[in-house]
UniProtKB/Swiss-Prot annotation:
Catalyzes the transfer of the diacylglyceryl group from phosphatidylglycerol to the sulfhydryl group of the N-terminal cysteine of a prolipoprotein, the first step in the formation of mature lipoproteins. This is Phosphatidylglycerol--prolipoprotein diacylglyceryl transferase. The gene is lgt. Keywords: Cell inner membrane, Cell membrane, Membrane, Transferase, Transmembrane, Transmembrane helix. It is an enzyme of class 2 (transferase). InterPro entries: Lgt. HAMAP family: Lgt.
């Protein structure tokens, strides 16, 4: 017997102010950046987490937000163009700048963030590993909101599920088959679980080992994404790749390896002392 749920009807527009229309996906980006900004400021101001003053000044973090926002948007769009739909955008290059139609890649956005961290850190002569730690500490917030927006938009739905699965759902654009609400799985794994793990690590003193949160985020996100991809329908223009893998899996495997290496190296280094971590607030 089928118990598939009907997908709830959501308006893709969160709200409108005159001619200005704000969609849920845009609101997720805005919310993730703003909430993440405040959360990172709280981490910077908590001297106990650093064993002294944080190596990143508050004013520097405030300036960095613009850099990382550009990295997320430009990197996310570039990654989607290159990794997921290159042939289409070669034929329709003008659509590359039409961001309101959707099409962003986490892996591209992450690379954009890496470039922003490196460029800003070197420009301001700040510890790049610590800047990366702060950026990755807030990352799950945006991931959680972004996956909820994917669900609201009825996009990136899951693979067909057993009709007896209590939470199997029929999506408006997914045909008649009940499917896994994989967006919610990913919101839980990439957002809630990853945030809790990193928060517990920070509470235990991980910020005193520059690069530990950075490496842990990279590796754990890769694991979470690979698990999520097991339930997510592959992008139709790509389908399954070698050995039944998806593009998301292929892009995430290197993250697991790189993350483990970065975290291991950070763990082997001696933790910051009060004098070594002294910075500005």
């Amino acid at each position: 017997m089928s118990f598939a749920l009907a997908f709830p009807v959501f308006d893709p527009v969160a709200f409108a102010i005159g001619p200005i229309v704000i969609r849920w996906y845009a609101l997720a980006y805005i919310g993730g950046i703003v909430i993440g900004w405040f959360y990172a400021r709280a981490l910077i101001k908590n001297r106990r987490l650093w064993g002294g003053a944080a190596p990143i000044p508050l004013i520097a973090w405030d300036d960095f937000i613009l850099w990382v926002t550009l990295g997320i948007i430009l990197g996310g769009r570039t990654g989607y163009v290159l990794f997921y739909n290159l042939d289409f955008f070669i034929a329709h290059p003008i659509e590359i700048i039409e961001l309101w139609k959707g099409g962003m890649s986490f892996h591209g956005g992450f690379l954009g963030c890496v470039i922003a961290v490196l460029a800003f850190g070197w420009n301001r002569k700040l510890p790049v590993a610590t800047l990366g730690d702060l950026t990755c500490a807030v990352g799950p917030i945006g991931l959680f909101l972004g996956r909820l927006a994917n669900f609201i938009n009825s996009e990136l739905w899951g693979r067909p599920a057993d009709p007896s699965l209590p939470w199997a759902m029929v999506f408006p654009t997914g045909g008649p088959l009940p499917r896994h609400p994989s967006q919610l799985y990913e919101a839980a794994l990439e957002g809630v679980v990853l945030f809790v793990i990193l928060a517990l690590m920070i509470r235990a003193g991980a910020l005193r080992r520059p690069g530990l949160i950075l490496g842990s985020f990279i590796g754990l996100y890769g694991v979470a994404r690979i698990i999520g991809e097991l339930f997510r329908e592959p992008d139709p223009q790509l389908g399954f790749l070698w050995g039944g893998l998806t593009m998301g899996m292929l892009l995430s495997v290197p993250m697991v390896i790189v993350g483990a290496i970065v975290a291991a190296r950070a763990w082997r280094r001696a933790p910051l002392t009060a004098s070594a971590s002294a910075g500005h607030t």
